[in-house]
Amino acid sequence: MKSNIRVRFAPSPTGPLHIGGLRTALYNYLFAKKNNGVFILRIEDTDQSRYVSNAEEYITDALDWCNIPFDEGPGKNEKFGPYRQSERKELYREYVDILIEKDKAYYAFDTSEELNTHRKQHEAAGKTFIYNWHNREKGRLKNSLVLTKEETKKKIEEGSNYVIRFKSPQDETLVLNDEIRGVITIDSNTLDDKVLFKSDGMPTYHLANIVDDHLMKISHVIRGEEWLPSMPLHVLLYNAFGWETPNFAHLPLILKPEGKGKLSKRDGDKLGFPVFPLEYTNEQTSEVSTGYRESGYFPDALINMLSLLGWNPGTEQELFTLEGLISSFGLSRVSKSGARFSLDKTKWFNQQYLQKKTDEQLAELYLTVLKTKNIQRLPSIDYIKS
């Protein structure tokens, strides 16, 4: 175990926080607090085309409601800030230039139309087009590996659109270790040369993610299973920079109640239950999605339920306080396989917490619900308790 534990929850502000993302935040928080570490919130907003203006506020409100406070983040203890990637734009250019100088990255000028033509030609021949060592230097593609330095410089000065790609190694066997999934072996010849940076001055997720994790001294990257395919590239990037690699842990998916397929944001009210901690209003369509808070659920009940969706305490115990979760949690008991969501079990947890509440606590909660629903004439606490 590394001595200084620093973990991060790094959502993209593209909409409301899904309960799968909330569980990722929770596991990071529990791991940090169990090991006297630091829990960081970082907003990964490099994809401005998908940016939603009220999403960051929603994320922080949801974490507040669930009692998962971050130690560092936007507007709070900004020791390694800024914590929004859009505010770190100039920084990423410096680091991609380092990769170019080390011959670990290169300029590519291929248009979308040209790349589509290559894909169709490969498909016609029963093959799959991969932009990597197999074809990057054979003259079919337009990049700085086949162009002279003068030709490359001229294209950039003329304003030609470009991307900067990572130069994946050839004929290497990558041996990766995941805290949950164990040892993973990858043939580097199967990897494509991912885009790291674009001519509009914005990095892609991969570059920004690695640079920020390094500069923020992240010790453990605990994230969803959907990022497992990115792990080889991320480890290669750490190696290319000559940086120490953090420990990785990829959490299992939260599955739909029938056990088939990931429980997604789109499932929401369609399946008859919330998939967001708080109610969310889409600013463009005015569509309202229900939340657990507005549906009468207690935050501690929701957190208790989510903690057991993928983690096993090793006992028959099901009800945990937040302090109990912190003392019991460990990555060694997180499952590799997906965890099925159960609405009945979620209701059961809420009922257990309801029974524990005092009359005074219930009265306070009742008033909060009325205020949330903009009911103006509120009864007094004494009236409710009577």
Residues covered by each model-derived region:
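Acidic, glycine-rich active-site loops and adjacent beta-strand->loop/helix elements
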Residues: I43-S49, E225-W227, P252-L255, T346
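Catalytic cores of large soluble enzymes that bind and process phosphate-bearing ligands
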Residues: Y51, R84-R88, K104-Y107, S168, ...
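Alpha-helix initiation and N-capping motif
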Residues: E56, K89, R93, S112-L115, ...
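Catalytic adenosine-cofactor/nucleotide-binding cores of aminoacyl-tRNA synthetases and other
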Residues: F241-S386
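A generic structural motif
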Residues: D45-D47, L215, I222, Y353
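Active-site cores that bind ATP or allylic diphosphates and position pyrophosphate for catalysis
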Residues: Y106-Y107, T111-D267, P274, V288, ...
